[in-house]
Curated annotation (Swiss-Prot):
Broad class of the protein's primary localization: secreted
UniProt keyword Secreted, yes or no: yes
Protein name per UniProt: Mammal toxin PlMT
Superkingdom in the source lineage: Eukaryota
Similarity comment: family membership: Belongs to the long (3 C-C) scorpion toxin superfamily. Sodium channel inhibitor family.
Function comment: Binds to sodium channels and affects the channel activation process. Has high toxic effect on mice but no effect on B.fusca and C.partellus larvae.
Length: 17
């Protein structure tokens, strides 16, 4: 996934804020 910054990913690979 394209992450504009340093967002951690949950186990599904989705970024959370």
């Amino acid at each position: 996934a394209d992450v504009p910054g340093n967002y951690p990913l949950d186990k599904n690979g989705n970024r959370y804020y």
